[in-house]
């Protein structure tokens, strides 16, 4: 039986999942607790990201044939994550003035899901986090609850659903040829799965 040490636990912390959990907690709390947490969430997430190394991994075996890799950290993902963590901290500062609990919480869920997309090491985790980001961002647009925001969020979800379906078709084609791992993505340049 494998022992879970503190070092092993630190390499398994997924910044995106931490941010998503904070987002749902923020939606449940009263306003006095919501404001500090909306700033604390990106700071904790940035700290968790800075603890990661190239050996960080968060595997999950869905079945004997399907293994999901929620964390794949290379230099490109590290750069994008650093930029996105900075943006998330700035968004947390902006979020201090946001009054609506669901807008504040769903913006954290959206930020966490985009971090999940950046760190995805396989096709399934990529599409899961992609779809979470679609619905979270649609709700952030809809949070004003008036006719204009409802129409804008409907148009947004239609465009995002079309893009998500094209991504899904491309990933299915990619998985058929190369498997679930995203390491061979550069090998399919020029093929239909790459362009979808």
Task: Outline where the language-model segments fall.
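Alpha-helical multi-pass transmembrane bundles of energy-transducing inner-membrane proteins
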Residues: 105-109, 113-195
């Amino acid at each position: 039986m494998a022992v879970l040490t503190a070092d092993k636990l630190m390499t398994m912390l997924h910044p995106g999942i931490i941010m998503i959990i904070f987002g749902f907690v923020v939606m449940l709390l009263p306003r006095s607790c919501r404001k500090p947490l909306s700033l604390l969430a990106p700071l904790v997430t940035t700290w968790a990201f800075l603890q990661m190394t190239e050996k960080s991994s968060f595997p999950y075996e869905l079945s004997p044939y399907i293994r999901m890799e929620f964390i794949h950290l290379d230099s490109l993902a590290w750069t994008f994550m650093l930029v996105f963590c900075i943006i998330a901290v700035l968004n947390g500062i902006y979020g201090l003035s946001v009054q609506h609990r669901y807008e504040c919480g769903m913006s954290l869920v959206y930020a966490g899901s985009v971090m999940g997309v950046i760190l995805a090491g396989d096709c399934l985790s990529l599409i899961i986090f992609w779809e979470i980001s679609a619905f979270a961002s649609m709700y952030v647009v809809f949070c004003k609850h008036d006719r204009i925001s409802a129409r804008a969020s409907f148009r947004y979800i239609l465009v995002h659903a079309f893009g998500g379906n094209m991504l899904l078709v491309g990933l299915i084609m990619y998985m058929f040829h190369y498997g679930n791992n995203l390491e061979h993505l550069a090998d399919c340049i020029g093929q239909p799965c790459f362009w979808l």
